[in-house]
Amino acid sequence: MPEGVPCGRRGAMLNVGLTGSISCGKSTVARMLEGKGAFIIDFDRLAHDVEEPDKPAWRGIVDTFGPDVLREDRTIDRARLGTLVFADRRKLEKLNEIVHPAVFEAWRRSVEEIRGVRPDAIVVSDFPLLIELGKQNDYDVILLVYIPPQEQIRRLILRNGYSPEEAIQRVNSQMSIEDKIDFADIIVNNAGPREQTQAQIDKIWTQLLKKERLQRKSAASSFQTGTIHKEREVG
């Protein structure tokens, strides 16, 4: 376990990494899990927060990509920035180098805040680049939201108004959804009607509750064993 990671394995909290690829419906699944009782940490929202005007990540973006990526109110124009970086993998990597350290620190703080309120919480982190960045070991469960690549493209065209070429470029700029399957503990097929996805989430939530209870029981047992060992040493 990497040092400094606020992972559920340290206690009863269950840390779930929710991932997928562009237009797969991670936010929809996150809302369903929130409705069941999960605490949600949205990495896109964290990125927005750390990119607020005059914060270090904001300054790094402006220094690297120029003032043209700013709106009149000095906030980042994410659509314009996205057009720049998704057309050039090196620029995308540079953006990630600027933003990710601040986002990960904000995530750690969020997890610890939840732990302080609900030590037995099920925390779901909506993290698009979880697998690409090799963060699997930060989580107790990896939950992958899946739709076929052609459905990704279709949804991008309908939802975002992209041309077919733009949609294909966005999909190809990321790790293939098919390549992510082997990294997942649980897969949600989100290609069908919403009701089918909800039915899957209902079953998955039962699994997560069971895992959290087992983890809590294991943590309590470990604590008791440690206490006994200490008492023997004192004696």
From Swiss-Prot:
InterPro entries: Depp_CoAkinase, P-loop_NTPase. ATP binds at S23, C24, G25, K26, S27, T28. It comes from the Bacteria. It is an enzyme of class 2 (transferase). It is found in: Cytoplasm. Pathway: Cofactor biosynthesis; coenzyme A biosynthesis; CoA from (R)-pantothenate: step 5/5. The keyword Isomerase does not apply. One of its GO terms (molecular function) is ATP binding. Signal peptide: none annotated. Residues 15-219 form the DPCK domain. Its EC number is 2.7.1.24. Catalyzes the phosphorylation of the 3'-hydroxyl group of dephosphocoenzyme A to form coenzyme A. This is Dephospho-CoA kinase. It comes from Syntrophus aciditrophicus (strain SB).
